[in-house]
Amino acid sequence: MLIRQSTAAATVYPTLEELLAAVRACRACDAHLPLGPRPVLRAGATARILVVGQAPGLRVHTTGIPWDDPSGERLRAWMGVDKDVFYDESRIAIIPMGYCYPGRGNGGDMPPRRECATLWLDQLLARLPRIELTLLIGHYAQRHFLGSRRKASLAETARAWQEYAPQYMPLPHPSPRNQPWFKHHSWFERQLVPVLRARINALAER
């Protein structure tokens, strides 16, 4: 199974649509996913904004719609966009670090599986040449894209957002479970969210 999927991932797909179809048909992690594979992602070649989160939760696995949950509601509020804009693939691409629901662990969902990034992420990014801003939501996305440039904590990384601009903007995960973090770091919504909204507005309206 893994060998076959690795071969498929090595294929050069003529269009983004064919690549997305191949990703959605991927079964590389079948044996490790409690509810089976259902890759959830979306992208259009003209998108200027890329949203990179963790992995779909149970509700998103059920609906097949990314960020179709309370976390998504808060994220859209941060961005200052409604659902019509958020789900407009010509403006915003949504590619998590893990494309399928990974199941539950102690205290929350399991981490995103690494196979997705290994097999597909580089190809997907290469098919999105117009991306100007990538939102790195949570430490899995920040670890992958920022590497050693990350700070010691997520809060420090978010505070240092200007070091990663204009290409990246590191954000905490908007999950309701992170409410204590938001209360402890009230500067985030006061200082960083307005900057985020201004960038999103400028790019989404082009």
Model-derived regions, located:
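A polyanion-binding, active-site-adjacent surface
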Residues: 2-204
